[in-house]
């Protein structure tokens, strides 16, 4: 199982990149995810930037197998503007070719929500068709470069699990699959005690045209098609991107389902380091526990520090008894 880590590499000066990569390596990480902000900020010099970033990774004995496409108003599958659509097809194609040379196997993409929300307020059917048309163009490029396009669930109507799965089912291509985002699914989960008033004011009207659809089990819908998963946590109402185990997700239940997914290629730590200021070591410990769970079926989220502390205390108590 590939365990890969996001980081806001675009916020670091190049001179510090390898220093931080060394931290990931020291704490047992083997893979890093190329994030969409990195790509979006280096469209004009992507080849040189990615070549340099890859050299930094190799120097610290790290690799990449997963990338996230740039996302948002100018990048998503269903954007309406014809000129921008032509542009992003060319740029996504360029990225796929370059990322293939780095060993990337999955390229996560957002369906998109800009033109569904005010002031545009497009309806779902035409946006769905636009997403299909973009995928029709990109899938031959993905196949040529042996990279799977992984469409991701989010928390707006165009990105709901049914929409994401619908795209995959319509194409029936091995080069189009799902990226399951655990934090996004948690935000849309129909859990006991859900209080719609705790969402951001205006969220339901803007992102769902007033008719929100909560999910009893989003992963059950996406499981047959899932090749990668973005793991992060939250309070159930905001996309906080906390570290796994720091929010309200039932991780034992979710990880058990992921462990039982034959098509799963990788899981990715999408915690927002620069937002929550979580040390690299702590993030790596959390995902080492997840990796152990995949191997053993036993989930132990205590950190190495806690284990060492308990070992010292146990030894002292034992010596005291003697």
Question: Which residues does each PLM region occupy?
Answer:
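Active-site acidic/histidine proton-transfer and metal-coordination neighborhood
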Residues: 19, 56-59, 77-180, 187
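C-terminal/domain-terminus segments
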Residues: 240-265, 282-284
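Short acidic/histidine-rich active-site segments
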Residues: 231-232, 265-274
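Acidic-and-aromatic substrate-binding clefts and catalytic sites of carbohydrate-active enzymes
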Residues: 7-17, 35-50, 75-78, 114-120, ...
């Amino acid at each position: 199982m590939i365990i890969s880590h996001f980081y806001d590499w675009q916020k670091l000066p190049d001179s510090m990149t390898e220093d931080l990569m060394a931290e990931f390596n020291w704490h047992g990480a083997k893979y890093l995810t190329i994030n969409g902000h990195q790509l979006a900020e280096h469209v004009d010099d992507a080849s040189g930037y990615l070549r340099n970033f890859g050299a930094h990774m190799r120097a610290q004995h790290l690799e990449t197998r997963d990338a996230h496409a740039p996302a948002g108003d100018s990048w998503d599958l269903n954007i309406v503007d014809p000129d921008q659509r032509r542009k992003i097809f060319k740029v996504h194609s360029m990225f796929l070719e370059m990322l293939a040379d780095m060993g990337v196997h999955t390229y996560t993409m957002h369906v998109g929500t800009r033109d569904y929300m005010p002031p545009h307020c497009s309806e779902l059917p035409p946006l769905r068709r636009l997403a299909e048309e973009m995928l029709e163009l990109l899938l031959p490029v993905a196949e040529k470069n042996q990279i799977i396009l992984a469409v991701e669930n989010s928390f707006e109507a165009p990105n709901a699990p049914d929409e994401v799965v619908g795209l995959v089912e319509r194409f029936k291509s091995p080069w189009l699959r799902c990226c399951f985002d655990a934090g996004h699914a948690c935000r849309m989960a129909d859990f006991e005690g859900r209080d719609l008033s705790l969402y951001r004011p205006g969220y339901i009207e803007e992102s769902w045209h007033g008719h929100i659809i909560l999910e009893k089990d989003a992963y059950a819908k996406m499981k047959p098609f899932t090749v990668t998963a973005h793991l992060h946590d939250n309070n159930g109402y905001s996309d906080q991107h906390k570290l796994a185990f720091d929010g309200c997700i039932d991780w034992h239940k979710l990880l058990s389902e992921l462990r039982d997914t034959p098509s799963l290629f990788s899981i990715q730590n999408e915690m927002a380091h620069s937002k929550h200021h979580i040390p690299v070591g702590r993030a790596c410990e959390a995902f080492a526990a997840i990796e152990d769970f995949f191997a053993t079926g036993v989930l132990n989220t205590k950190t190495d520090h806690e284990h060492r502390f308990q070992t010292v205390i146990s030894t002292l108590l034992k010596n005291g008894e003697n």
